[in-house]
Amino acid sequence: MNRSKFESVFSEEINQYLDHMLVSGYKERSYYYLLRKFDRFCIEYEICQPIFTHQHAKEWIHRKENEASTTHYARVNGIKQFLIYLNRKGYQIFV
């Protein structure tokens, strides 16, 4: 799969996480789209430092209008795993 370029402050970490998941046997496609949404979210909310605050988390977990509960669950929990990954690497991340 050809990856589009991620553009947020977390772009390098997103690519490393995708590589890690591929090596672990997961399919890139299942994570790519969620991480792309997260990348856009970070740009939209002008996250310029590699820090994810409580306020950012509140905005991310807010259920979108017309978002199915299963889609909401997948979006929130898929990115939660990425945030845990960042937290373990020493980033200031609210999980």
Over which residues does each language-model region extend?
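Intrinsic, low-complexity N-terminal interaction/targeting segments
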Residues: 1-6, 48-52
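Intrinsic-disorder-associated interaction segments
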Residues: 3, 7, 72-75
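Extended non-catalytic domains of envelope/secretory-pathway proteins
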Residues: 10-12
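N-terminal core-binding DNA-recognition domain of tyrosine recombinases/integrases
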Residues: 14-29, 33-95
